Amino acid sequence: MKNLMLSTAVLALAATAAVAEEVRVYNWSDYIDEELLAKFEQETGIDLIYDVFDSNELLETKMLAGGSGYDVVVPTGTFLQRQITAGAFQKLDPSKLPNKVNMWDQ
């Protein structure tokens, strides 16, 4: 499951980056290796603003306050339904994911 979420986050990041000079990411601390983040910036020329959280409560507080400005957020399932119901996230538009063919159907 962690690999699926990581793959989805990376593909969403790449799709978001395709139209941006900067991508803002909010993720669990130690979830993506800093070397991978640096490699992404180097290969794409896109600046990453990479903020981390260490608890579901911190994530939820920021997301439910609204206007976080993040392009990619990596939540966990524990609080996810409440955050979705509150409108904290936008639905992904598959037509804007050019690398969707590389994603699992699950």
Regions found by a protein language model. Give the residues of each.
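Positively charged n-region of N-terminal signal peptides that target proteins for export
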Residues: 1-4
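Early extracytoplasmic/lumenal segment of secretory-pathway proteins
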Residues: 21-83
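Sec/Tat signal peptide C-region and signal peptidase I cleavage site
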Residues: 16-20
